[in-house]
């Protein structure tokens, strides 16, 4: 009986030890490019809720589009002894050194939505960003199969912006070569800011004497700025224009006819998946990958989700059905 009692005591102690070790809060640092953009506010809320529901603590900081601020914030997170670092980079070219610091401390690193180049990443989660660009260009070509096109790229330091452009040109290059489409301007928008897109579009309209038939804009913020310039010249609704992110303002513009389409990236799926992967990384669990991308240093295992083109015809079946926006907020 004594032996049995001792064994039971030992098992009980081990169970308590195991349980307390398992319940130790996993600490995740979430470094966000710029919370001034509606898009990232949604990602933050969904990610934090999911990670916390899985027993993790999440520390969030926004760099407001500033490289040095993001590096400093990541260093601060490293000093807080986080287990996993999740980064939405402002500039995917400047974080390799600070990521090396994190790795030396045994911290796992997950790139969220945007790939970070030449860095020792553990995993990458995003959408198929070349497909985003293809959807944008295909939608605009369907409305304006010929004419003068203006290409409005995103931030020149955002790797995704380059992938969007790559996808766009897969569709546009044959039409440019055949002469059906003429590119009358091509500019990138620093930090994806609407006010910069407004200035770029104003200058483009002046340079082309308002003779622009379509704008391939890479996201909704830049589309919004461009549409302001088009409206001032009485061209709103006459010039086809793409977007991305399914921002509420953009969906409203699609309803009123000033924006042609947006690309909806089901952010709930992305943020939930990223939170799951972050927790799995922290627990050293095996992670399911469905792709691999080379970032210049290594082949990074990745999980890529499918984006969806949204126009007037399928708003109900996409953003409303998913609860991304309510019918009331869109139509009232």
Curated annotation (Swiss-Prot):
Pfam families attached to this UniProt entry: Peripla_BP_4
Keyword vocabulary terms for this entry: Periplasm, Signal, Sugar transport, Transport
Gene behind the chain: xylF
GO biological process entries: D-xylose transmembrane transport
Protein name: D-xylose-binding periplasmic protein
InterPro entries xref list: Bact_Solute-Bind_Prot2, Peripla_BP_I, SBP_2_dom, XylF
Span of the signal peptide: 1-23
Top-rank taxon, per record: Bacteria
Organism: Haemophilus influenzae (strain ATCC 51907 / DSM 11121 / KW20 / Rd)
Subcellular location: Periplasm
Entry GO CC: outer membrane-bounded periplasmic space
Cited PANTHER family: D-XYLOSE-BINDING PERIPLASMIC PROTEIN
Key word Oxidoreductase present: no
């Amino acid at each position: 009986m004594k032996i049995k009692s001792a064994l039971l005591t030992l098992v009980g102690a081990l169970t308590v030890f195991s349980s307390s070790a398992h319940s130790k809060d996993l600490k995740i640092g979430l470094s966000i490019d710029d919370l001034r953009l509606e898009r990232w506010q949604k990602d933050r809320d969904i990610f934090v809720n999911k990670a916390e529901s899985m027993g993790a603590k999440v520390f969030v900081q926004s760099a407001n589009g500033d490289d040095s601020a993001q590096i400093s914030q990541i260093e601060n997170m490293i000093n807080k002894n986080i287990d996993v670092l999740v980064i939405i980079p402002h500039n995917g070219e400047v974080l390799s050194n600070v990521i090396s610091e994190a790795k030396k401390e045994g911290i796992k690193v997950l790139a969220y939505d945007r790939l970070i180049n030449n860095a020792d990443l553990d995993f990458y989660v995003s959408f198929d960003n070349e497909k985003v660009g293809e959807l944008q260009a295909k939608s605009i070509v369907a409305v304006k199969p010929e004419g003068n096109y203006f290409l409005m790229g995103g931030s020149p330091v955002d790797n995704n912006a380059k992938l969007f452009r790559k996808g766009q040109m897969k569709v546009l290059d044959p039409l440019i070569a055949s002469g059906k489409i003429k590119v009358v301007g091509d500019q990138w928008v620093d930090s994806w800011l609407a006010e910069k897109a407004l200035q770029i579009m104003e200058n483009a309209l002046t340079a082309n004497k308002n003779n622009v038939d379509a704008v391939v804009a890479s996201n909704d913020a830049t589309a919004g700025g461009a549409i302001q310039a088009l409206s001032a010249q009485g061209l709103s609704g006459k010039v086809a224009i793409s977007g991305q992110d399914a921002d509420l303002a953009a969906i409203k513009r699609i309803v009123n006819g000033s924006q042609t389409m947006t690309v909806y990236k089901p952010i709930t799926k992305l943020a939930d998946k990223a939170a799951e992967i972050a927790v799995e990384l922290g627990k050293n669990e095996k992670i399911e990958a469905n792709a691999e991308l080379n970032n210049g240093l290594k082949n990074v295992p990745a999980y890529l989700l499918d984006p969806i083109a949204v126009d007037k015809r399928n708003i109900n079946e996409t953003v409303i059905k998913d609860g991304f926006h309510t019918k009331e907020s869109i139509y009232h």
